[in-house]
Amino acid sequence: MAHGPRYRVPFRRRREGKTNYHKRLALLKSGKPRLVVRKSLNHHIAQIVVYDPKGDKTIVSAHTRELMRDFGWKGHGGNTPSAYLLGLLIGYKAKKAGIDEAILDIGLHPPTRGSSVFAVLKGAVDAGLNVPHSEEIYPEDYRITGEHIANYAKALKEEDEGKYRKQFSSYLVKGLEPEKLPEHFEEVKARIIEKFEEARE
């Protein structure tokens, strides 16, 4: 509702909570491709996007479903380990497409230190993509590998196996014991690296 004669209605995408136009303008002024990271409750998505007057163009993209389909990821798509693996994947895809640098675009997600959007960033940087950042914003290594999830699962299983099976049913139905998530993480990470490193040779 208007608040007086000087009230200005915000742009539609701002009203809908989709675009911060001040931040978007600053990103566009850099002239670099954008590493766009978005997340939902169950998944993450990453894209390399370049500005075009007729509309932004997506050069490459990756989704956590792709980790499950192509690399055998059995963990949750919305957690920190899957976010890192997604970053690794989009980083390699970007390099393959000739993109060597980008600037991070997390949209309206709050820039909370250690959040999963910064796990995507770390994965992309580890793949060789040059993105300006401070390493202080990265999640701790034990969160990236999923060790915190494994430790919680172990404790819960000892305390209440019924609750353990209910909470981690999506892992168990795929044949993954959540206590072994760090090992599984390393296996999937190795598959991603192997695929793209072999393609370079």
From Swiss-Prot:
Q: Which SUPFAM superfamilies match?
A: Translational machinery components
Q: Name one GO biological process term.
A: ribosomal large subunit assembly
Q: Which GO terms describe its molecular function?
A: 5S rRNA binding; structural constituent of ribosome
| Keyword Ubl conjugation annotated | no
UniProt xrefs under InterPro entries: Rbsml_uL18_euk
* Keyword Cytoplasm annotated: no
Keywords assigned by UniProt? Ribonucleoprotein, Ribosomal protein, RNA-binding, rRNA-binding
Where is it found, in Gene Ontology cellular component terms? cytosolic large ribosomal subunit
The record's comment on protein family reads:
Belongs to the universal ribosomal protein uL18 family.
- Known HAMAP family for this protein? Ribosomal_uL18_A
Task: Describe its function.
Answer: This is one of the proteins that bind and probably mediate the attachment of the 5S RNA into the large ribosomal subunit, where it forms part of the central protuberance.
Q: How does it assemble?
A: Part of the 50S ribosomal subunit. Contacts the 5S and 23S rRNAs.
Q: What is this protein called?
A: Large ribosomal subunit protein uL18
Origin organism of this chain?
Thermococcus onnurineus (strain NA1)
